A protein has these predicted regions:
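A fold-level detector for beta-propeller and closely related beta-sheet-rich head/sensor domains
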Residues: 1-320
Length: 320
């Protein structure tokens, strides 16, 4: 994972490869702090406890990152309430391993504690909740260039290329892909575009067109893409009114480059490059599958021909 620091604040980009070679990988940006524990400098969570499991080197099961809040009782379908991650069909299901005494009434499927789960808490939770009634307030820009000039404009559905699904029976549109970018469409289940029938013959896999499950309130659970090589940049700069602003800048492999308020975890704005527009449909469709080294031993040439390399977007470090 990549990280950026400012004073005692540590911002860590996280990701998890998707199962079944799917290209939509979940990610998040989480904040911890450096603190003194028994005279030693340690990475600590929002409660001031050591955040890292000393045996695994990963974030501990009961650590709670900054910005993360309890979502044990949120709006669900049918006018009921329940834990945010209940019934969303995520694989693996992010069930907390903390005991009942530690949870103190919180659900094991709440965002808090987020522990090592990528989707839980952090910036992802704040973006979901920041726009829980409508994504229309999100500032998503399109960056276009002409020579040495860079221009920013609001991203619109007409900016996206015409869809070209690998499955001929697909009926989704550029408007669906646009809603997915904003978080109001959950995207498709995805997978391999062809599959074997009972006669061992390849046919189109219509199951990849099944929709993911959309939460009853808020934006899609997969609102934040993976952060693999993008190191978060922390920057303090002068504002127009004479004060100073502190922001965190970083890219992720859902096609967006983000600016976050480190106090709240809120997304101030995000932008997409015109050079990345052609790959956004693949994020929505979650297909074709990713081509990894060594797959030749497990698949025949017809299936291998449908695989494509994993897409990378704003995947490097930011400089000033």
């Amino acid at each position: 994972s990549q990280q950026g620091t400012s004073e005692n604040q540590v911002f860590i980009g996280v990701f998890r490869p998707a199962k079944e070679r799917k290209p939509r990988w979940p990610g998040n940006l989480k904040q911890y702090k450096l603190g003194l524990i028994d005279g030693n400098v340690e990475l600590v969570d929002a409660n001031g406890d050591i955040a890292v499991n000393s045996q695994t080197g990963f974030i501990g099961a009961c650590a709670t990152s900054e910005w993360t809040t309890d979502t044990s009782q949120v709006a669900k379908s049918g006018g009921t309430t329940g834990p945010y991650f209940e019934g969303l069909g995520l694989d693996p299901n992010p069930v907390s391993e903390c005991d009942a005494d530690f949870l103190n009434g919180r659900s094991v499927l709440s965002d808090s504690p987020d522990g090592p789960f990528v989707e839980k808490g952090g910036a992802a939770q704040q973006i979901r909740g920041q726009h829980n009634s409508s994504s229309s307030t999100r500032n998503i820009f399109l960056a276009t260039s002409s020579g040495t000039s860079l221009s920013l404009s609001d991203l619109t559905a007409s900016d996206l290329p015409t869809v070209s699904s690998a499955v001929s029976s697909a009926t989704y549109t550029t408007a669906d892909v646009f809603d997915y970018v904003h978080g109001e469409d959950p995207g498709l289940a995805g997978g391999d575009p062809i599959t074997l029938d009972s006669n061992a013959s390849y046919i189109e896999n219509d199951a990849i067109l099944d929709s993911e499950i959309m939460p009853a309130d808020g934006l899609r659970a997969s609102i934040h893409g993976d952060i693999i090589h993008s190191r978060p940049l922390t920057l303090t700069y002068g504002a127009a009114n004479g004060s100073t602003e502190f922001r965190v800048f970083y890219g992720s492999n859902d096609g967006l480059y983000r600016a976050l308020d480190p106090t709240t975890g809120n997304e101030e704005w995000s932008m997409m490059s015109e050079s990345h527009l052609s790959e956004i449909e693949r994020q929505y469709a979650n297909s074709p599958s990713v081509d990894y080294d060594g797959l030749e031993a497990s698949f025949d040439s017809q299936m291998l021909a449908t695989f494509e390399p994993k897409p990378y977007f704003f995947d490097g470090s930011t400089g000033v």
